[in-house]
């Protein structure tokens, strides 16, 4: 037969929640730092691909418009 577990104290709950928040803050800080590094253009060890599809399509439409003029 199933027996209900003992209730977790407020202090344990608070400690666990604090640990969880600290982990989340650390991950967010790391991601933000990486994003700043990529956007600054000074990254030498981090490789990533740039998606230029949207810029190519906008350039082609602007070129087409200038040809008509």
Swiss-Prot record:
Keywords tagged on the record: Chloroplast, Plastid, Ribonucleoprotein, Ribosomal protein
GO CC, alphabetical: chloroplast; large ribosomal subunit
Localisation: Plastid, Chloroplast
Name of one Pfam family that matches: Ribosomal_L32p
Gene Ontology BP annotations: translation
One Gene Ontology MF term: structural constituent of ribosome
InterPro entries (UniProt xref): Ribosomal_bL32, Ribosomal_bL32_plant/cyanobact, Ribosomal_zn-bd
rRNA-binding found in the keyword field: no
Main location: plastid
Record-linked HAMAP family: Ribosomal_bL32 (MF_00340)
Family: Belongs to the bacterial ribosomal protein bL32 family.
Name of the molecule in the record: Large ribosomal subunit protein bL32c
Annotated organism of origin: Anthoceros angustus
